Every structure is written in C-alpha cells, then in structure tokens.
C-alpha cells in the first residue's frame, strides 16, 4: 500500500526501540490501572469497614450488571482506538478528528439508551442473577445512581481512549489522579455525612464516583483546549458530531464483535455469580473482593493489550510491519515478566491482602481458596490478550471474538456449573472454570494467529 504521509509519532530513523517506547508508554498506563483499582479498593474497603459485609455484597452483585450494560461502549472504544492509532500513524489529522466526533456522538447516544434501560430493568436483572434478598434493593438503588450519569461518564472514558490511541498515556494518568483524589475525598463526606452533607451510606460511594468522573472530564476538556491539542473539542470535531457514515460503519465493524464479546463475558459473570450466590452472601462478598484483587493481576494483561493494540495500529498506519512483529514479541515478554512477579507477590501476601477487605473468617477462607486456584492462570489470559490485540489492530476481529466466546461459554461456564453442582468440589468448582477457559483461549487464539492471520496481507483501514 502506498504511504504518502510520514507517521506522526516520529521519523523512522529516529524512533526508539520498541522495548523503550512500549515501556515508557506502559508505565503511566499501568499506574493508571493501579490508581483506578486503588480507588475501587478504597471504595470497597470504606463500604466494608463502615457498612459491613452485606453492603459489600450489594456492590459486588451490581458490577456484573453494570459491566454488561457498558460492554457495547467498551467495544466501540476499542474500535475507535484502532482507528485513532492508524490515523495517527498515517499522520492524517482530518480523519483523526472525524473518528473523535463520530465516536463522541455515538457513545453519548448509546449512554442515554443504556441509562434508560439500566434504570428501568435493574431490579429484574438482579433477581434473575439470584442476588440475595437482603441486599437486592440496596444494590438496585446503587446501580441507578450510576446509570443516570452514564452518558457523561462515557464521554470521559472515550476521551481517555482517544488520547491513548495517539500514544499519550500520561494525560489520562494525570486526569485519573484528579478523579481519584476527588473520589477518595468525597467517600467519608458522603457515606458518613460530614461537613453538613447528608449521611448517604452505600449510595455515597456511587455519588462520589459520579461527581469525581464528571468533574475530571470538565478539567480535561479545558486542558486540551488551552494546550491546543489535536484532540480538543474544536470546530472540526464539532462538524463530525453529525457522524461520518463511512467511519461509523467501520467503527461498528470493529467495535460490534468486541462488544458482543464483552456482553457475553458479562453474561458469563452473571451466570458465575448466580452459582456463587447459591452459597450465600459470604460467598458473594468473597467473590467481589477476589475480583478486586484479581484486577491487580489483570493490570499487566489489560495494559499490555491496550499498548500492543495502539503500537500495532500505529505501525500498520505507517506501514512499518517489521516493527509490528517486534511489538508482539515485546508485549508477550513483558506479560510474563510483570505478571509473574505480581502473582508471586500476591500469593506470598494473600492473607494480609484479603484481610484489608474482610474480617469474617468464613468469608476470608472462601476468598483465599478462590485466589489460590485462579491467580496463576491470568498469565495465560494476558498472553491471549496480546495476540488478540495485535490481530484486532489490523481489523481482524471476528475470529478472536469467536474464540473468546467459545472459551467462556463452551468452557468456563459449563465447567463452573458441572463442577459446582455435580462434584464434591462444590463452590471450588466455580473457581476452576477460570483457568480452564484461559488455557483453551490461549491455545485457540495462538493457533489462529500462527496458521491463518500471519498469512494474510495486512493493510491500514484509515485512508
């Protein structure tokens, strides 16, 4: 393919090594994920310590539902990051702004639709999930607070995706610092009712999230305008708010399969938590806390998946296919180095970590067993994520999605159901489903990458 423009990143001869470039990009990205998890961790700790295990169970029951309803937007975001990366690599600022404008409008409208659906059907869905009756109404009301603010929260998430797509991982990190500080500062004020504010209990946690996110989005918009950033909300971006039909179709082609995958992942989590809920609120609380801890283990995988996708998209946009191969290799190595060290540390200090969230011995015991069974397998998850991210950056989204869906619904959910219902493992059988699914996913995704994708001719999507 002809390339008439130089890549935006830098001239080819002056580019640093992939190891250096990806590491420099990865540090703020990892710190962002750490900070985001710290914010969630502090929120969960505040709820658990101040309000008790039932409040933790209420929040834990809600998150699979929330993830289900935002899955489509996450998929669209992944599609927009591919297009942003390729446009940036091709040094095509007009198309860059077109992607921004089109994505913003579609994302906002989608947020409105999901806010309405979520607020109306929250209670019904939580009942289908088997949420314990002693927490279901609190969980539903907590959810509605976040749903009402969803359209505006989505705009903030979209802009952080755009920035990372251009190779800027620092600005999203700085804005996240602002958001986290505001959120943590508001938690005691709104939960306990301080400085004249009403005592909102568990709902104070939701309001703190909403206020901090929207405030940070406004700060980010002002910053981009003052810096005259290419992604600022200027006349060109506003012109494309009407949505470029060609780009929208391409965005949906890239984003819908990823969204379907996200939705089915969410449904699987709803299925899994329904298995867990069968064992009572202690098991539900343990599940929620271990998910928080596992989010730290997933950080290298998720961060590297984002980094590899962006670097791969920029390499494809600039027609630098030798660099693309290096991106894949470096991503896989970093996954095992960073993820391996983190997993070892969490295994060693597992009791101390879980005790930060939980005080009841039965819940601690359940959570510890879950952690021991599943933690190591996130290395396999990370490897599969990196290979999949590379293929998605080229526009190959269907088969990575099919493989992921099969691993979840053909392996994880059936294994969790059968082992928990028909063997002596009981609740331990639920946990075994995770490593089984991650192993199958890696084997299948690597097979497709090696024997099919590598034989394809790769061309950029943004012209």
Swiss-Prot record:
A Pfam family the protein falls into: MatE
UniProt keywords, alphabetically: Antiport, Cell membrane, Ion transport, Membrane, Transmembrane, Transmembrane helix, Transport
UniProt membrane topology term: Multi-pass membrane protein
CDD domains in the cross-refs: MATE_yoeA_like
Broad class of where this protein is predominantly found: membrane
Residues passing through the membrane, by range: 24-44, 56-76, 106-126, 143-163, 177-197, 202-222, 256-276, 293-313, 330-350, 370-390, 397-417, 427-447
GO MF term set: antiporter activity; xenobiotic transmembrane transporter activity
Cellular localisation: Cell membrane
Any one of the GO BP annotations: monoatomic ion transport
Any one annotated GO CC term: plasma membrane
Family designation: Belongs to the multi antimicrobial extrusion (MATE) (TC 2.A.66.1) family.
The protein's name in its UniProt record: Probable multidrug resistance protein YoeA
Gene: yoeA
